[in-house]
Amino acid sequence: MKKSWRNNVEFYLIGLLLLMVIAFSIAMPNIFWSVSNFQSIASQMPVLGILALAMAMTMLCGGINLSIIATANACSLVMAWVATSYPPGGATALATLLAGGGAAMIIGLCNGILIAGIRVSPILATLGMMTLLKGINILITGGSAIANYPQWVLWLNHAQWFGIPLPMWLFAVVAAGLWVLLEKSPLGRAIMLIGSNERATHYSGFNTRRVLMWVYVISALLCAVAAFLMMSKLNSAKASYGESYLLVSILAAVLGGVNPDGGSGRIVGMVLALFLLQIIESGFNILGISPYLTMALWGVLLLCFIQARGMLGLERAG
């Protein structure tokens, strides 16, 4: 059935986005509309955006992945070790990316086995994985950072195409790929059905355990992509980087229309939510407002949006 504007999540997000743009345009027209400000937003959004997509993948099937930050840090440490241990070159670059992807697949498979195979609660399984990975990351590095990467790692963060940072293009490609996966593929349909009712989906002939395994592997691989972007941006890798992204990624997913109980959500809504959060953060930074107040505003925004979902029936908007 066609959705009306009243239960269309994207409609409200566009309204909030326009409201924020108008407010910041009035408060600081010259700075807010500067090219450097929008390039700054475009450079900051990809890491958070890809991590939020990694979180959303698991929430769509009724789960959650609390280990996304620990997974990203583990992958970045593995890639950092390979990139700094061997001479720069095509073989080293390929080995670095394969090592990060391999580490992500192992972590994703472990989460998938715990959740789909052993039937551990997603929140407990990924919380345990997060704690395990953080401990291993700190143990291996001693809490210190691995830095001073070769130029080919740093190139990604500085490269632009049509004036837009290359990481933003990479985020767009990842988001478009996930949209195709969720909207046009049998796997995407199965993910949504599992989120709505896993038992009924199983009895309908779907291999729900295999689907859940794929979900957590894809989530981990997205973390590896975010990890490489963090490496390129920060020129270092550390066990404790990006910890504030965990709650913000959940916020972006829910604000973007992903049902925390699973079964509904759209990539378009998530992208709009990410733009909204980044514009708020950028505007507050320019105004010199404390980042803690920004975080508090995000919390208020989430609570208000949850209330709106209940009042306007947005929870039924898939």
Predicted feature descriptions by range:
Residues 118, 122-185, 211-214, 233-242, ...:
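Transmembrane helix-bundle core of multi-pass membrane transporters
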Residues 87-129, 173, 272-273:
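Alpha-helical transmembrane segments within multi-pass membrane transporters and channels
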Residues 30-40, 137-140, 182-183, 188, ...:
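Inter-helical junctions in multi-pass inner-membrane proteins, predominant
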Residues 223, 233-299:
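Transmembrane alpha-helical segments in multi-pass inner-membrane proteins
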Residues 92-100, 106-111, 163-237:
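Helix-loop-helix "hairpin" substructures at the membrane interface of multi-pass membrane proteins
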Residues 13-25, 55, 101-104, 130-135, ...:
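Hydrophobic core segments of alpha-helical transmembrane domains in multi-pass membrane transport
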Residues 22-28, 33-87, 113-119, 254-267, ...:
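Single transmembrane alpha-helix segments in multi-pass membrane proteins
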Residues 1-23, 176, 196, 202-210, ...:
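Cytosolic-side transmembrane-helix boundaries in multi-pass membrane proteins
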